[in-house]
Regions:
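Short active-site-adjacent helix-start/loop capping segments
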Residues: 57-61, 84-87
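Short functional linear segments
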Residues: 1-53, 60-62, 66-71
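ATP-dependent carboxylate-amine ligase catalytic core
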Residues: 22-29, 34-37, 41-44, 70-124
Length: 124
C-alpha cells in the first residue's frame, strides 16, 4: 500500500465519528484493552500528560509540547482532528511522523486489527 491507500484503509475500514456520527461509538473498553495488551501496554514505558476538557485542548497541548521540547524533552503529541493530512495528529518534537511510518504500522498490524473491528478512534 502507498500512503493514500493506507489512510483510505484507516478511514474506510473503521467507523469514523466525523463521517457517520454516533453510530461509530462503541460501548465498553474491550477493544481498548485488547489493543493495549497487543502493544504491550506502551503507556507504561514513558511519562505522559493527558489533557482533557471541553475547550482549549489543542492550544494547551501544543503550548505545553513546545515548552517541554524547549526544555530538552523528547515530546510526542497526539491531537485530533486533523485538517489536511492524517499525520498532523501524530507529532514527535513538532514533526509529523513520516508517511512510511504510517504505512509500515498499518501493514504490520492490520491482521490483528481486522477481526477486532475497532473504531477509528480506538485504532488511531
Amino acid at each position: 500500500m502507498n500512503y493514500q491507500e493506507t489512510t483510505e484503509y484507516l478511514f474506510n475500514s473503521t467507523p469514523v465519528f466525523e463521517h457517520i456520527g454516533a453510530s461509530a461509538y462503541k460501548e465498553g473498553l474491550d477493544n481498548t484493552y485488547a489493543l493495549d495488551e497487543y502493544f504491550g501496554h506502551p503507556h507504561t514505558n514513558f511519562r505522559s500528560i493527558h489533557i482533557a476538557g471541553t475547550n482549549g485542548k489543542g492550544s494547551c497541548s501544543h503550548t505545553l509540547a513546545a515548552i517541554l521540547q524547549a526544555d530538552g524533552y523528547k515530546v510526542g503529541l497526539y491531537t485530533s482532528p486533523h485538517l489536511v493530512d492524517f499525520r498532523e495528529r501524530i507529532r514527535v518534537n513538532g514533526e509529523m511522523v513520516p508517511e512510511q511510518y504510517v504505512i509500515d504500522f498499518v501493514e504490520e498490524h492490520k491482521d490483528f486489527f481486522e477481526p477486532l473491528h475497532p473504531s477509528f478512534f480506538e485504532l488511531t
